[in-house]
A protein has these predicted regions:
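N-terminal membrane-targeting hydrophobic helices
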Residues: 1-145
Length: 145
């Protein structure tokens, strides 16, 4: 329930977290990206073992968090946003290079899968704080006197 555009007291969203219908649309968008990338990958005639073995590869960029949360979030978000893999897809398609096209579609599929599962882009304050997380129903913090 929303009151004046704000979340009701039983729904505590972290700042910057998408809630409500826009959040559901973003999750659907992630699923669509995943399905589309699977279809696109199938046209490359590359081994499905390649797709399975590289599907989680972008998560290696979470290692950036060892150098601090701000750097980690920046590096992770760079690997979990669509411009770089879309560029790979474009170059692969333009040059007729099926492996490059396949790598781009696998990368986009990973991003779509993450979005569908509510793993969003990270904020620098906390690894768990994303644009899609933190909207779940949470208990208000207890304040002890």
């Amino acid at each position: 329930m929303k009151v004046d555009g704000q979340a009701a007291s039983d729904e505590v969203a972290l700042p910057g977290t998408v809630v409500g219908a826009p959040r559901r649309w973003l999750l659907l968008e992630g699923m669509t990206l995943l399905v589309g990338s699977i279809v696109a990958f199938s046209t490359t005639h590359q081994s499905w073992w390649l797709a399975l073995s590289l599907l989680l590869a972008p998560d290696i960029f979470a290692a950036g968090y060892m150098l601090g949360t701000r750097f980690g979030a920046h590096l992770y978000n760079m690997a979990h946003a669509t411009p770089l893999p879309a560029l790979l897809v474009g170059v692969g398609w333009w040059q007729g290079h099926q492996l490059v096209l396949a790598l781009g579609t696998i990368w986009l599929g990973h991003i779509g899968m993450d979005r569908m599962l509510t793993f969003g882009l990270k904020y620098p304050d906390n690894f768990q704080h994303t644009h899609l997380s933190g909207a779940e129903k949470q208990q208000e913090p207890h304040h002890y006197a």
